[in-house]
UniProtKB/Swiss-Prot annotation:
rRNA-binding among keywords: no
Organism phylogeny: Eukaryota, Metazoa, Chordata, Craniata, Vertebrata
Coiled-coil portions: none
Gene name of this polypeptide: MT-ND2
Keywords: Electron transport, Membrane, Mitochondrion, Mitochondrion inner membrane, NAD, Respiratory chain, Translocase, Transmembrane, Transmembrane helix, Transport, Ubiquinone
The protein's name in its UniProt record: NADH-ubiquinone oxidoreductase chain 2
One term of GO molecular function: NADH dehydrogenase (ubiquinone) activity
Catalytic reactions on record: a ubiquinone + NADH + 5 H(+)(in) = a ubiquinol + NAD(+) + 4 H(+)(out)
Length: 348
């Protein structure tokens, strides 16, 4: 791609997200979301592969549907109350419809069906952008809307997302689909605690970005897109495979890794809010996610091909990929649990 075109598209991605962050008017927030969507579509289709084009088309249709729902809901609220302010979305129909549209944008269950299919058709770099950056703008609107939204709707979205995110990943062999279901489950954890403690949602979102970025960058460096390719990765780069396995276990919430922190804090807060049944369901759903992460780690570490190679292993050669970003993300994904009191002090 022409570097000037690439610069314009990346700038548009940043502009759209920033515009949505800074907006208090629904029309400006909607414009930011659409600028963001139009910029990412060209980046998604740059491979000129049928699967990439199909994924781009599916993404466009879902995002266009969500955008139409948001515009309709905002107009309905303005007609009923005379308010375009995001924090004054008080009409019940408009509030519920907007929340469902934003849930469709970020891939919350039961509006999640597009996400595994779209992520499967993209390369790992675009999958990383779709799983992290593209969720920031809609999630900012969800955070602002949460006080005026029906609590039962948020709880239902959260529970369904964690359960479906866990069940959906059990029978998958494609790594991108597994990470898509992981994203759905993590979004469920964030959305269910949003109505009680928004600060915990922000902590969970930040740690999710660290862990997901580390996972995508590790798999990209290992050139792995299927589970069976992980079995041959150990002989090529043992250090990379070891850290990748730990990152995946961190995504699953296994202590003493970073991913345990948000789940522990959220379960603790749900218990304080007298919701033991909800906390129990969330904990059981976390076990489902942890199972398929353990399966991936098993495939990487304990199923090594019984052969030797005479070729020079890649870790002895000069790599052409920068490992600085991966190293920083790995530190965040693996070692932040001891800093829990410090992080809590910063947000509370």
């Amino acid at each position: 791609m022409n570097p000037y075109v690439l610069m314009i598209l990346i700038s548009s991605l940043g502009l759209g997200t920033t515009l949505t962050f800074a907006s208090s008017h629904w029309l400006l927030a909607w414009m930011g979301l659409e600028i963001n969507t139009l910029a990412i579509l060209r980046l998604m289709a740059q491979q000129h592969h049928p699967r990439a084009v199909e994924a781009t088309t599916k993404y466009f249709l879902t995002q266009a549907t969500a955008a139409a729902m948001i515009l309709f809901a905002a107009t309905t609220n303005a007609w009923a109350t005379g308010e375009w302010d995001i924090n004054n979305l008080t009409h019940p129909l408009a509030s519920s419809l907007t929340m469902m549209a934003l849930a469709l944008k970020v891939g919350l269950a039961p509006m999640h069906f597009w996400m595994p299919e779209v992520l499967q058709g993209l390369d790992l770099t675009m999958g990383l952008i779709l799983s992290t950056w593209q969720k920031l703008a809609p999630f900012a609107l969800i955070t602002q809307m949460a006080p005026n939204t029906n609590p039962m709707l948020l709880t239902t979205l959260g529970l369904l997302s964690t359960l479906i995110g866990g069940w959906g990943g059990l029978n998958q062999t494609q790594l991108r689909k597994i990470l898509a279901y992981s994203s759905i489950a993590h979004m469920g954890w964030m959305i269910i605690i949003l109505q009680y403690t928004p600060q915990l949602t922000l902590i969970a979102l930040g740690l999710y970005i660290f862990m997901t970025s580390a996972a995508f960058l590790s798999l990209k460096m290992a050139s792995a897109t299927k589970m069976n390719t992980l079995t041959a990765a150990w002989s090529k780069s043992p250090v990379l495979v070891s850290t990748t396995a730990l990152t995946l276990l961190s995504l699953g919430g296994l202590p003493p890794l970073t991913g345990f922190m948000p789940k522990w804090l959220i379960l603790q807060e749900l218990t304080k809010q007298d919701l033991p049944a909800t906390a129990t369901i969330m904990a059981l759903a976390a076990l489902l996610s942890l199972y398929f992460y353990l399966r991936l780690s098993y495939a990487m570490a304990l199923t090594i091909y019984p052969n030797t190679t005479n070729a020079l292993t890649p870790w002895r050669t000069n790599t052409t990929q920068s490992t600085l970003a991966l190293a920083l993300m790995m530190i965040g994904a693996l070692g932040l649990l001891p800093l829990t009191p410090t992080i809590m002090a910063l947000f509370f």
